[in-house]
Amino acid sequence: MKTVEIPFGFFACLLVNVHAANDPDVSVLAKIAEEALTNTSINACDETNTNNSFIYCYGRLLAAVNVHNLFQDSKSFVDMPLKFDPEVIQEEFNRRFGEYELQAINRSALQAFVDENFESAGNELEDCQLEGWNEHPPKLMKIQDSMLRDWALKLNAIWKLLCRKMKPNQNPKRTSLIHIPEEFIVPGGRFREFYYWDAYWIVKGLAASGLHSTIKKMITNFVTVVDRYGFIPNGGRIYYLGRSQPPLLIPMVYEYYELTRDLAFVNKILPTLIREYEFWQNNRVINVSDDKGNTFSVFHYHSKCNVPRPESFLADIIHASRLPAHERPKFYMNIASGAESGWDFSSRWLKDGHKIETIETTDIIPIDLNAFICWNLDILQYLLRNTGNPLKSKTLRDKREILRQAMFHVFYNDTEGAWFDYNLRTKSHNFNFYPSIVVPLFGECYQPLNLARPQQIVNYLNKMGVYNYPGGVPTSLIKDTKQQWDFPNGWSPTNHMIIEGMRKSSNPVVQEQAYRLAKKWVLGNFKVFQETGHMWEKYDVNGTAPQPGSGGEYLVQDGFGWSNGVILDLLTTYHERMRIEPGDLMPNNNASATNNNGSTTGSASERMHSKSITPLIPIIISILYTYLLTR
């Protein structure tokens, strides 16, 4: 691949502010920010679980920095360590700016204050050495195709670049980081800390690389967090303490146990795993009744935070400015709940399918969350049985069966032959396509002897045309939402869950469909890596060839933890069969892809011409963006 050095200044003009020119002025934003500083606010963190929440989770300083838009990304500020104790900084802020209303604070003076009192974002972390890292892991060396094997070894080396640990002698009062004892793998880009559900696919990749001790350390970190807070937050910062993410700690432990048979470790942490399950049972359950009067207990995402998210403060108050004041607290709650889902954000959560201001996450009962919980129960009963606790194992096995039956009654539609989200407001299913409908197969939360069930799901996916895209399965078929969990983006975890859900089936036809999608996803990622030298957080699966994805509240990020993990897992799963055949790396010259409306997206040659320069733009912008944030 030929490398061309491009002067930084040449593309500097491409770096645009993420906020539009018609956004509200400072006075409007200041008024909305002041509303969130009331006594009825439920903040992301507070004095009950932190000792610096008034800096990072709420307060006039946080509001002022965002109202005056000191940073392109709100997350930059709340990731900055303190140079002094938080009480000292708060007192100095009050002395300098306490007499001014938010909009009247001088922006230059505020910037100078931040520069004097805060260090660079991410400065409390340092790189680490991966114990047992091997340049040629045995599993990867079994990959038969030489090009794919060489690529896998390059991805294996990226783990060393993503390994982080906390610097010694850190003062926890002076950082927003949640302190954990062991090293961990970060996703990459702006994501400088651990993230909950990302870690599952990172673990899958670490397993392929033979890094079992790193997996154990990451699990130990999560166990420490559950022991401290009673649950696992969205990510490793205190401003994430108001919400979780899809519950995948227990599946991570299952992966580790199957690799190592380390029963002593599993037995030691089992009480904590049960406690993590109980968080969801005690805080995220809602009852749903059918038209026959039967009531079912199911799970939904429901953060109680009713204020702007600290890491996305400016974006939240800009959206809130388009709503009446009395609707804003519920909007913030639904935004936080959408972030808890991991799908931040998607038409899946939007009342009108397009505008973020119509978000109604808490009114939606998601099929994938319930399938995750069902999977958790199956793993827990298995681990309990293996550690000599058959009675507790049976209790959880019975709970799983009750939930499996509830999932059939609440989510399954006989006509379509698939599971769908259930909307409490409309009392109906959302029949739009989302990959989440396959998670019951992934978590094996259906009757495994029913060979027709997986085939019905495959038939539905075929009917929706989601296999027709050259780069993989998109996250929805809803267009023009500008949300990252919608068309045309495809994500590693969703494609992996579709593949694994079908592969685990006993139906050989469905298993073959899994392989075809796996090869498509692998080759798409490979092409982008060949072009850019990077793995990306998400991919545009449309057009003649995939490219880095776009949309959402921030620029596309490289790295990237779960993308690397999925590829390594698929390459080792299909290590004998998957090969690059002649013509595989050529652009897709097939006829036009059909969209969900039955119309076409244009011929291959037209799409290639229109996108010839497009793949470079998000890459260049992302690099410039990261560069400026770290200056």
What are these regions (language model features)?
Residues 226-269:
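Aromatic/His-enriched, Gly/Pro-containing loop or helix-boundary segments
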Residues 584-617:
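C-terminal GPI-anchoring signal of eukaryotic secretory precursors
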